[in-house]
Design a protein with these regions (language model features):
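C-terminal motif of bacterial Sec signal peptides marking the signal peptidase cleavage site
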Residues: 16-19
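Small-residue packing motifs within transmembrane alpha-helices
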Residues: 9-10
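A surface/extracellular/periplasmic glyco- and lipid-processing/surface-interacting theme
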Residues: 26-63, 67-85, 94-349
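Positively charged n-region of N-terminal signal peptides that target proteins for export
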Residues: 1-6
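Short, conserved catalytic or interaction motifs in soluble domains
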Residues: 22
């Protein structure tokens, strides 16, 4: 009887233990993998960058640059096409009269002009950017270069009334114009390549622009020796660009009155030498020298060098980057030079 009771107790205890164990068993949840989206690299805003402006684009950038000799005589103003130029070079021709070399690659103006005659140093600048060079007439030195095929070119002397058109509103030699359509037409007729972009300049990124150093300067005046050909630039804070003036008159498009606005103003000095009785010059674009670079309302002293035919601002031998946008380059005699012929004015002065 006692054995029976012991066995019964053991059976009851076993049942109780088994029951408790079943209650204590907790089934752990099976982890479910969540679909976490992978972070993708941010796509660039544009796929290309224009080599002469540093401006982004999704269009082709392979078009060849075109350099046009633009008349800057008082009787030739206001001009056509300057607002579309990527780069404009301004320097003396004869006497105290300046002339402009307008370079186009990212934009094509409907019409450019008035067109003026070639000079050898402008040809050198155009050659450095592998441009098709457009002029109407030439100096003896320039004529020699053109006839020898030094640069692909269109000369209005041979296309007056065909590719080049005369405006009835002005008198010669201040009335020769050419459309961009006719530039391309003439280039194709002569078998010139219309593709082949120039090498790119160095441009600053957004962070580098924020860290720009230099003295605050809102206005600059450049003296070429005669008031009618003196040039001024004024920084427009709201637009973040420079407005250009000739003897106090703002530079605008002839037909639309759209003002010329630029992002970089580079002023350099170099040796000038008068070579004939007419007052033509030899201008040294090889040796380098001193300069001022104006960007975003600030100015800094730089040096310039000729790098593969291009005028490039440097500091301690390193390229000084340009603000993406348009650039105007003023080249002045080094006698008396920057300190005498360039006036820098700070805000409020």
């Amino acid at each position: 009887m006692m054995k029976r009771n012991i066995v019964l107790c053991l059976l009851v205890a076993g049942v109780l233990i088994t029951g408790c164990s079943k209650k204590e068993e907790v089934q752990e949840p099976v982890p479910v993998e969540e679909d976490v989206p992978k972070e993708e690299a941010e796509a660039p805003e544009f796929v290309h960058t224009y080599p002469l402006t540093g401006v982004g684009t999704n269009d082709s950038i392979d078009q060849r640059a075109v350099a046009v000799m633009v008349n800057n005589h008082t009787k030739a103003r206001p001009q056509s096409g300057l607002t579309k130029a990527d780069i404009v070079y301004e320097m003396l021709a004869e006497g105290e009269v300046t002339r402009l070399l307008a370079v186009y690659q990212s934009e094509k103006p409907e019409q450019v002009g008035p067109i003026r005659s070639a000079r050898d140093y402008y040809i050198e600048l155009a050659k450095g950017l592998d441009c098709i060079y457009v002029c109407h007439g030439n100096s003896p030195d320039a004529e020699s270069m053109l006839k020898q095929g030094y640069i692909d070119h269109l000369n209005g002397l041979y296309y007056d009334g065909t590719l080049f058109k005369r405006s009835s509103e002005r008198k010669a030699p201040h009335n020769s114009y050419i459309s961009f359509e006719n530039i391309e037409k003439g280039a194709m007729e002569k078998g010139y390549n219309l593709t082949g972009a120039p090498a790119s300049f160095v441009f600053l990124n957004k962070e580098e622009i924020k860290r720009l150093e230099g003295d605050s300067v809102t206005k600059v005046s450049i003296n070429y020796g005669f008031p009618a050909y003196n040039t001024q630039f004024e920084y427009d804070v709201q637009q973040g660009k420079y407005k250009r003036y000739s003897n106090g008159e703002q530079t605008k498009e002839a037909t639309t009155s759209v003002p010329v606005l630029v992002d970089n103003v580079l002023i350099i000095e170099t040796a000038h030498r008068v070579i004939d009785k007419v007052g033509r010059r030899d201008i040294d674009l090889q040796s380098g020298g001193k300069g001022y670079l104006l960007q975003k309302g600030k100015v800094k002293e730089v040096e310039w060098i000729n790098k593969d035919g291009r005028i490039v601002p440097v500091s301690n031998g390193v390229d000084v980057g340009l603000i993406p946008g348009k650039t105007w380059v003023n080249i002045i005699p080094n006698q008396p030079g920057l300190t005498k012929n360039v006036t820098l004015n700070a805000a409020g002065n």
